[in-house]
Swiss-Prot record:
One of its GO terms (cellular component) is Golgi apparatus. Residues 1-6, 78-81, 147-149, 193-257, 323-325 are lumenal. This is Signal peptide peptidase-like 1. Its EC number is 3.4.23.-. It comes from the Eukaryota. The active site is at 186, 265. It is an enzyme of class 3 (hydrolase).
Length: 372
């Protein structure tokens, strides 16, 4: 009975909001990836084509991630300002990518004229795109000044969506290879890294705050309003919510005051969801409309992967609440997402096609290896 009462904490605003946000972002990332791939295919524009991982690249991701973890564990204070600057640039680009379709939709709905403004880096920019780019840059500047958790989450979500659109999995075989390797990676760095490095490397890196280069520059130039600029920043590599979401918790006081979920725990499952969403669309050839996904949902693998993600996420949070210790989310998310997809595709005799991926008959597509 005591355990049940403990688990009721998951119904509190912070964990409930985290769960809803993560599930929504994961699905939105997969759906955006599908539309992006179709847009590139329709326009025959492969200059911004996504990267399709092969087996060697999939195996290298956990290795490179481990090296990055150790680098940030030992040298974070030395490279934090550089990381912040790089993250700020990536955030502007990701935010622009995420919001561009909405800007186009609003322009169409309002019947606005949108003349070309200029050309930059072989790309034509319209007036609305220019305004959107300025708005994205101002959002990142606001984050650099305030460090507010809402802006941190906004930038993190945009990075997740952009990553899933531009880094693709060609088939379930490569997907399973990647997920299993990251499954082991997550378990090792959360549960066993303390035995080798004297501290929980994953937790230490996840809770570190970066030095703010804007504060450093303002301080060196003795600019007015220095007290308004936050000295430390949470990098948008995770989404965070105050544990007392409705209680007026001051952002950035302590990492322990926040619930957090790494972007990888959304982006990696979203890559699987993007793969099965593309497979569903290829099999049914439905119109790419988010509301049309409800039709014939019993024939779509996305409706096994997405609930599986939600169940795995709830299980991870429940384990954390019961054990009062950090949990490797992929320990729960990998079986709960990959398992149902493989089992149902085996039952429906689609596993062979999913396992190897679609045959590319178009030579242009083959040369560019465009997969959604």
């Amino acid at each position: 009975m005591e355990t049940l009462w403990t688990l009721l904490y998951l119904l509190e605003p912070a964990p409930a909001t985290l769960i809803v946000t993560a599930v929504t972002v994961t699905f939105a990332s997969a759906f955006r990836a599908l539309n992006y791939g179709k847009e590139m295919e329709r326009n025959r524009d492969f200059s911004e084509a996504s990267i399709t991982l092969d087996s060697s690249q999939a195996l290298m991701i956990p290795v490179m991630s481990s090296c990055s973890l150790l680098l940030m564990f030992y040298l974070f204070s030395s490279v934090s300002q550089l990381l912040t600057a790089f993250t700020a640039i990536a955030s502007v680009s990701s935010l622009f990518y995420w919001l561009s379709p909405y800007a186009v939709y609003m322009k169409t709905q309002l019947g606005l004229s949108d003349p070309f403004l200029s050309r930059c880096c072989s790309k034509s920019f319209t007036r609305i795109q220019g305004l959107l780019l300025v708005a994205c840059a101002m959002t990142v500047v606001a984050w650099l000044i305030s460090g507010h958790w809402v802006l941190n989450n906004l930038l993190g979500i945009s990075i997740c969506i952009a990553f899933v659109s531009h880094v693709r999995l060609p088939n379930i075989k490569i997907c399973a290879m990647l997920l299993v390797c990251l499954f082991v990676y997550d378990i090792f760095w959360v549960f066993f890294s303390e035995r080798f490095f004297g501290a929980n490397v994953m937790v230490a890196v996840a809770t570190q705050q970066a030095s703010n280069p804007v504060h450093t520059v303002a301080n060196s130039l003795n600019l007015p309003g220095l007290q308004l600029i936050t000295k430390k920043l949470e990098l948008p590599v995770k989404i965070v919510f105050p544990r007392n979401l409705l209680g007026g918790v001051v952002p950035g006081v302590s990492a322990s005051d926040f619930m957090m979920l790494g972007l990888g725990d959304m982006a990696i499952p979203a890559m699987l969801l993007a793969l099965v969403l593309c497979f569903d669309h290829r099999k049914t050839r439905d119109v790419v409309n988010i509301f049309d996904l409800k039709s014939s949902k019993g024939h779509k693998y996305i409706w096994y992967a997405l609930p599986g993600y939600a169940i795995g996420l709830v299980a991870a949070l429940a384990a954390g609440v019961l054990t009062h210790s950090p949990q490797p989310a992929l320990l729960y998310l990998v079986p709960s997402t990959l398992g149902p997809v493989i089992f149902m595709s085996w039952r429906r005799k689609d596993l062979a096609e999913l396992w190897e991926g679609p045959a590319l008959s178009n030579p242009i597509e083959k040369s560019h290896e465009i997969e959604i």
